[in-house]
């Protein structure tokens, strides 16, 4: 389970992890699932994904999402709904999943990409309230006194 500093940490992260595990179990080609903030912090992960790997996947997914958003802005193509990266042995899907959050899935290369995209959209709709990630606020220096 990935920890989140909010007061709802245990409940929220536990619910997210359960929903991500459900996705991995139902769609057999999905290897791993992670929920991340737009700045690349993992806030939930499927079972079987080590914390270090969840954090790495979240950072990579955040980078791809950021690049896609930049391309959309630069070329007047609008917002990004989903980013997909095809590798020799896997696909990486990244989709917006609520205010300030993304859902990332790593799948086998044999995955039905249409089915994966459909299931991602269902998951995002089903758990939108769990996927809200408030923007981080910079720490203020202590008051002089």
Where do the protein language model's features map onto the residues?
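Acidic, low-complexity cytosolic segments
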Residues: 1-30, 39-145
């Amino acid at each position: 389970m990935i920890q989140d500093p909010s007061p709802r940490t245990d409940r929220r992260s536990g619910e997210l992890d359960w929903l991500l595990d459900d996705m991995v179990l139902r769609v057999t080609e999905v290897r791993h699932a992670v929920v991340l903030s737009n700045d690349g912090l993992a806030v939930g992960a499927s079972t079987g994904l080590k914390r270090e790997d969840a954090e790495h996947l979240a950072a990579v997914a955040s980078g791809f999402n950021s690049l896609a958003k930049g391309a959309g802005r630069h070329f007047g193509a609008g917002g990004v709904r989903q980013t997909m990266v095809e590798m020799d042995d896997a696909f990486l899907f990244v989709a917006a999943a609520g205010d300030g959050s993304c859902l990332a899935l790593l799948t086998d290369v044999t995955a039905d990409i249409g089915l994966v995209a459909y299931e991602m959209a269902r998951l995002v709709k089903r758990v939108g309230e769990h996927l809200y990630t408030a923007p981080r606020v910079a720490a203020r220096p202590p008051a002089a006194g």
